[in-house]
Amino acid sequence: GDNSLYTQDNVTVPDRSWRLTATGRKQADCIGRWLVAQQQLFDRYLVSPYVRTRETAATMALPKAKWEETRVLRERSWGEINTITQDDFRTNYARNWMFKRTDPLYWRPPAGESIADVSENRVHNLLTSLNRRAEAESVVAVTHGDFMLALMLTLEDLSDEEFMRRADDPAWAITNCTCLHYSRRDPATGRTSSRVRWEQTARPVFDESTGRWEVRVDPWREFQRPLLSNGDLVDVVHSVDPHL
């Protein structure tokens, strides 16, 4: 990759202080316009206190928004490798580098957080707070890609294997300004479930023919909490080769 931006001035900038690029602002404007067309107003507006998420929220220009900054939405901590190149990471943290490639769910950067850490700590804190204070409300939250992966892991009760499968599939990638819409309302019937059961993904994509950013919207999908029988557990175990 291009390491030219890893200058002394840049690597000493705290992660929370980075602003959006020009492309990032166009993506934020694009998803904001789409979101306003879907739903004019929300009951609560949450945003990570990082500068780039503040800028994203402002650029989205949601009408009458009153944003609440909350640190639970902050970016996943990348610890000691936050501002070093991939080559430096591989050289100076060879063992940790190996686990990053083989175990993206539980892998933790040196002095940083794993996706599982973010899920078990901050995502659960957020959902507990929303269940208590905003159970029947519509909420928009501007956060970061890995936090969104942890949110997906938690809300959909994904197994380790399913998370790993999605991590290897580009179709599940959280690209810049991706919008994950989780709902308790059945999009087909309008009936409300007791728990979140439906999700729709929308993301800005660049249309080469028009030279403009447009939003690509995936179909709604339904998910349910997986419950495994003894036989299901045995099948999972047998799918893994013994190591001893």
Regions found by a protein language model. Give the residues of each.
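An N-terminal RHG(E/S)-centered segment typical of histidine phosphatases
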Residues: 1-43, 55-58, 185-244
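Domain-level recognition of soluble alpha/beta enzyme cores
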Residues: 9, 158-190
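Short glycine/proline- and acidic residue-enriched helix-loop micro-motifs
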Residues: 16, 96-117, 222-225, 238
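Conserved AMP-binding/adenylate-forming core of the ANL superfamily
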Residues: 20-25, 112, 117, 182
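Phosphate-coordination/substrate-recognition cap region in phosphate-metabolizing enzymes
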Residues: 29-98, 168-178
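Generic structural signal for well-ordered alpha-helical scaffold segments
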Residues: 29-36, 119, 123-131
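Glycine-rich phosphate-binding loop signature in dinucleotide/nucleotide-binding domains
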Residues: 38-41, 130-137
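Generic beta-sheet signal
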Residues: 135-146
